């Protein structure tokens, strides 16, 4: 039955027949495909493996492709990998090749100056409007993962809308005080999105909370608190930095025991050993934007993280009495409404009863 399920997934893969030597990336213009995959393709070619970078719809799509053909390779966000893996067989289906060479960061955007931390977002989730990129995007998947992690906060969001891309999500978030956009990307101070946020009066909210940072998969942390630069320094003005949660970029393939042919299985094992033995520098660009960005990105110390987590928790605690009072008022209102409905029901019942006829008076 499992082989049949994988075959069904293969039929659903966009672009027709898939190849066993695919390195599934993401959008053709995205960082996975243009920045990271070429280095991996080069290293595999040197080891006599003929793998080619292949565009895809992102992490979830890559996982479906590897589930269908264990010899393929996929890039993805660790949080999405953790979210989707159980439904596809987990450790029986996937082998992680690389786990934490580089990280993507989660950004929350709003124009509301009263929202300054994740706790503010969490306690107001039922009243906020959340705008996300498409449902199949890594950003939307990250938000679903955060909802699973924060059952008393963002899980209670009642208004979640998906739009065409992160740029549109940001535009909508900057149009109203009750709106927040979430998106995931590699921190890049040259990216026009960060400039737009600043120019239009918006700000980035640190996506940091104990419920987020405690998440793990197979003993590995899913999110790390990092400080990263989002705007470059200007004359007489330093660059803008933000602290937020970042999730590792994971590289994965299928488990060798799912490869039925003996020679193909051994080749697959050799490929796995080759990639796992590579040094980090061999898989990252040595020059250009990303090498500069990651030199300006640092993981926070435990003490610094605790201070930020406390800010989020304080926001939740301050809101708790108001939330409880709102529940009480809501309960009282419901009880009064129920009593009013019962009275109206009784009044209607009496109105429907026939009026008794009086006996005629004697003449």
Place the predicted regions along the sequence by residue.
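Bilobed "Venus flytrap"/periplasmic-binding protein-like clamshell domains
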Residues: 21-47, 52, 104-170, 175, ...
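Amphipathic alpha-helical membrane/lipid-surface binding segments
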Residues: 290-293, 297-359
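Pocket-flanking alpha-helical
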Residues: 37, 54-92, 167-173, 179, ...
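Segments of small-molecule ligand-sensing domains
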Residues: 233-313, 361-363
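Sec-dependent N-terminal signal peptides
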Residues: 4-14
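A structural signal for short loop-to-beta-strand junctions that line the ligand-binding cleft
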Residues: 90-104, 231-242
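Pocket-lining segment of extracytoplasmic ligand-binding domains
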Residues: 78-81, 113-114, 139-142, 147-247, ...
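Sec/Tat signal peptide C-region and signal peptidase I cleavage site
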Residues: 15-20
């Amino acid at each position: 039955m499992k082989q049949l399920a994988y075959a069904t997934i293969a039929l659903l893969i966009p672009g027709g027949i898939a190849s066993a030597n695919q390195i599934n990336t993401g959008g053709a213009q995205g960082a996975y495909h243009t920045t990271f995959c070429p280095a991996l393709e080069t290293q595999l070619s040197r080891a006599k493996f003929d793998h080619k970078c292949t565009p895809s719809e992102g992490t979830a799509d890559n996982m479906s492709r590897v589930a269908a053909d264990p010899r393929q390779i996929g890039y993805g966000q660790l949080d999405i990998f953790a979210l989707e893996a159980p439904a596809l067989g987990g450790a029986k289906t996937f082998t992680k090749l690389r786990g934490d060479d580089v990280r993507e960061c989660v950004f929350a955007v709003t124009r509301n100056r009263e929202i300054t931390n994740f706790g503010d977002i969490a306690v107001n989730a039922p009243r906020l409007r959340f705008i996300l990129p498409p449902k199949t995007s890594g950003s939307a998947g990250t938000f679903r993962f955060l909802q699973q992690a924060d059952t008393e906060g963002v899980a209670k969001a009642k208004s979640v809308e998906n739009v065409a891309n992160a740029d549109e999500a940001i535009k909508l978030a900057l149009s109203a005080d009750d709106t927040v956009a979430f998106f995931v990307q590699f921190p890049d101070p040259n990216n026009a999105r960060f400039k737009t946020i600043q120019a239009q009066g918006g700000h980035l909210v640190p996506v940091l909370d104990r419920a987020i940072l405690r998440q793990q998969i197979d003993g590995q942390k899913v999110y790390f608190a990092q400080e990263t630069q989002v705007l470059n320094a200007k004359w007489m003005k330093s660059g803008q930095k933000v602290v937020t949660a970042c999730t590792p970029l994971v590289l994965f393939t299928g488990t060798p025991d799912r490869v039925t042919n003996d020679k193909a299985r051994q080749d697959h094992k050799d490929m796995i050993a080759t990639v796992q033995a590579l040094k980090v520098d061999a898989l990252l660009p040595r020059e250009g934007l990303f090498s500069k960005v990651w030199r300006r990105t640092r993981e926070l110390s435990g003490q610094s993280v605790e201070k930020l987590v406390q800010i989020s928790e304080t926001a939740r605690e301050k809101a708790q009495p108001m939330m409880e009072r709102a529940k009480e008022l809501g309960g009282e209102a419901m009880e009064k409404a129920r009593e009013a409905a019962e009275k109206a029901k009784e009044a209607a019942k009496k109105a429907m009863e026939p009026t008794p006829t009086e006996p005629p008076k004697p003449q």
